[in-house]
């Protein structure tokens, strides 16, 4: 018995609702789960699902089949989301070395809110980085050689422009 995938129904004595029928006992296992997913994943439209037929084929109540199908879709969509996230985070890794036989990385091809293509990884990462963290990211990119001013400033002013302003202020 596994507490993560076991549902326990407790029958409490008391007034029974009119027309209530106890659900029939049934057994569910991984083999039936795989068989159900193999059938459901090939269907083009949710209206094409014959819930009664699935219920009869698996010897499980229709309410359970519906709930299980929704759970299977949720799990598979989450795994796809994680796979996409891992691929995009691997593309953003700055220390990735390319070998001679590697093909060049494909462009990101993401549309921004104005329908313009964002092909540069740096542009995409700047959109995904919150404005409060951008100064810290710039410090990390130059190997920690920044003067620390960029962390305190929320303005996007280059380090050389700040140095020029400081030199002008000190009249050097």
From Swiss-Prot:
GO terms for molecular function: SNARE binding. Residues 147-158 have a biased composition (Low complexity). Plays a role in autophagy. Functions at the preautophagosomal structure (PAS) in order to form normal autophagosomes under starvation conditions. Also plays a role in mitophagy and regulation of filamentous growth. Residues 114-131 have a biased composition (Polar residues). GO terms for cellular component: Atg1/ULK1 kinase complex; phagophore assembly site. Keywords: Autophagy, Protein transport, Transport. This is Autophagy-related protein 29. The keyword DNA repair does not apply. GO terms for biological process: autophagy of mitochondrion; cellular response to nitrogen starvation; piecemeal microautophagy of the nucleus; protein localization to phagophore assembly site; protein transport. Belongs to the ATG29 family. Residues 87-158 are annotated as: Disordered. It comes from the Eukaryota. InterPro entries: ATG29, Atg29_N, ATG29_sf. It is found in: Preautophagosomal structure. The lineage of its organism: Eukaryota, Fungi, Dikarya, Ascomycota, Saccharomycotina. It comes from Eremothecium gossypii (strain ATCC 10895 / CBS 109.51 / FGSC 9923 / NRRL Y-1056) (Yeast).
């Amino acid at each position: 018995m596994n507490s993560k995938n076991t549902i326990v129904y407790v029958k409490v004595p008391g007034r029974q609702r009119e027309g209530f029928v106890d659900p029939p006992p049934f057994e569910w296992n991984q083999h039936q789960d795989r068989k159900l997913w193999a059938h459901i994943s090939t269907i083009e439209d949710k209206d094409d699902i014959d819930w009664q037929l699935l219920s009869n084929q698996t010897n499980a109540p229709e309410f359970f089949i519906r709930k299980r199908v929704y759970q299977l879709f949720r799990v598979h969509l989450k795994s796809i989301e994680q796979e996409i996230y891992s691929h995009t985070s691997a593309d953003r890794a700055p220390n990735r070395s390319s070998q001679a036989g590697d093909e060049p990385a494909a462009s990101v091809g993401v549309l921004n809110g104005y329908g313009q293509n964002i092909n540069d990884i740096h542009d995409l990462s700047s959109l995904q980085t919150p404005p409060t963290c951008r100064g810290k990211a710039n410090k990390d990119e130059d190997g920690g050689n920044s003067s620390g001013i960029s962390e305190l400033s929320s303005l996007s002013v280059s380090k050389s422009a700040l140095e020029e302003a400081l030199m002008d202020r000190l009249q050097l």
